[in-house]
């Protein structure tokens, strides 16, 4: 994959640059207390859990809420992202504890195996929930089973580097300033805690769900972004096919030209794909 394609998918620059706040919808807070997530509920109908990605808030799904009004959406907001205080996410591992907390919410709200849709890091969380048998079906948006693969690495190879990078970003004054500047300059990431972002990046670089895909019982659909360059789009498609081969029956859909935030760059096509996916619940 060319440098442009790799840069587009960088977990830090791509995830942060795509963390758009598209306005604040009207919603009702769910009666659920958590030090790791907040949940808001919008609409009535069959249950769908929406999980945003790195440094993003639930505003990334505003277009979905408007386009698909016949579902009850449970919007996850990870603490430490997009203006929400970090609380228990302020230090230590993030991804698995957040997945556990979303699973706790599903049980507390008495949701019967809802559809779960996750973008970027949210896609990783969606797959982790699927491995807990908490989902009836799963849509992953522009994420590979191994977070490190999004930048051309592996969990074993990039994991060590991510540990070092995480230590630099959170343990040194220069690193904290650098990450804070990136957050401040990125639309939608403002209000995100740099240390929470660094911890999330470290977790993602060390997670590889590829070997566990055969255990994923729920139907899986993966929507991924491709650019206008045909050769790069072909390389991206080949990578997604190879990396999701462990889950038989996975439906892969390319949407482009698009950057990482498919729902913002191609809203009509994304909402149509999501609408078709949700017909299965």
Spans of features found by a protein language model:
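N-terminal twin-arginine translocation
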Residues: 3-13, 17-31
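Flexible "cap/lid" loop of the alpha/beta hydrolase fold
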Residues: 138-167
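Conserved loop-alpha-helix segment in the C-terminal half of the alpha/beta-hydrolase fold
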Residues: 224-258
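Conserved HGGG/HGGXW glycine-rich cap/lid loop of the alpha/beta-hydrolase fold
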Residues: 41-85
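Conserved hydrolase catalytic core segment
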Residues: 114-149
């Amino acid at each position: 994959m060319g440098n442009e394609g790799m840069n587009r998918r960088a977990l830090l620059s791509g995830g942060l640059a795509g963390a758009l706040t598209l306005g604040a919808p009207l919603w009702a807070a769910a009666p659920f207390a958590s030090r790791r997530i907040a949940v808001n509920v919008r609409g009535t109908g069959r249950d769908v859990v929406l999980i945003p990605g790195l440094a993003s808030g639930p505003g990334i799904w505003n277009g979905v809420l408007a386009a698909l009004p016949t579902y009850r959406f449970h919007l996850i907001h990870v603490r430490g992202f997009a203006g929400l205080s970090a609380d228990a996410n302020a230090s230590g591992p993030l991804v698995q504890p957040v997945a556990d907390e979303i699973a706790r919410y599903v049980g507390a709200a008495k949701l019967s195996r809802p559809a779960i849709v996750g973008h970027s890091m949210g896609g990783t969380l969606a797959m982790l929930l699927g491995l807990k048998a908490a989902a009836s079906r799963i849509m992953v948006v522009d994420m590979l089973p191994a977070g490190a693969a999004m930048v051309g690495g592996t969990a074993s190879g990039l994991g060590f580097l991510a540990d070092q990078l995480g230590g630099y970003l959170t343990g040194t004054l220069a690193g904290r300033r650098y990450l804070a500047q990136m957050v401040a300059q990125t639309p939608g990431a403002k209000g995100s805690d740099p240390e929470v972002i660094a911890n999330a990046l470290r977790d993602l670089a060390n997670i590889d769900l590829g070997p566990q895909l055969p255990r994923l019982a729920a139907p899986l659909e993966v929507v991924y972004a491709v650019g206008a360059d045909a050769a790069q789009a072909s390389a991206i498609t080949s990578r997604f096919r190879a990396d999701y081969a462990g889950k038989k029956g996975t439906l892969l859909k390319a949407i482009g030209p698009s950057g990482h935030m498919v729902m913002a760059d191609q809203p009509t096509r994304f909402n149509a794909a999501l609408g078709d996916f949700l017909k299965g619940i």
